[in-house]
Amino acid sequence: MSFRCPVCSQELKKEEKIWVCPQGHTFDIAAKGYVNLLMSNSSGAKRHGDDRLMINARRDFLSKGFYEPLREAVYDALSADFPRDGTLLDAGCGECWYTSYFKSRLDESGLEPQVLGVDISKYALEKAPKNCGVERA
């Protein structure tokens, strides 16, 4: 899976501490492992996505199990035709509540997926590595 530069749409390549495109546009990888590809100047926003309060409220809600039947049903549909070395992209992964579950279940099935989670909330992405070892961007 590859990512595209939000400035020029060329392919980004991961280097040690940055993602860079052939035109030289660079995006720093944060100490916590994520990279922000949003163009704040063009959107007028300084912050994107859920804040810490929203993240904590969602975590509290999800911990009560209300969405576990939904998560299981989505996994059943996902795994029915998932290729052995397939790629799973969770767009809007948040803290990776679904992502970590899908990854562990696919791993248990011997499917060896490449799993990526993307989100616009830096606060969610800061928590994601604690939930599972997914690539973050």
Residue spans for each PLM region:
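Secondary-structure transition/hinge residues
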Residues: 66, 82, 107-110
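Class I SAM-dependent methyltransferase SAM/SAH-binding core
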Residues: 87-89, 95-137
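N-terminal auxiliary segments of SAM/dcSAM-dependent transferases
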Residues: 1-47
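Class I SAM-dependent methyltransferase Rossmann-like catalytic core
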Residues: 51-70, 77
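Short helix-loop-beta connector
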Residues: 80-87
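Generic structural signal for well-ordered alpha-helical scaffold segments
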Residues: 75-79, 103
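Long, contiguous hydrophobic alpha-helical segments, chiefly transmembrane helices and signal peptides
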Residues: 27, 34-38, 54, 61-62, ...
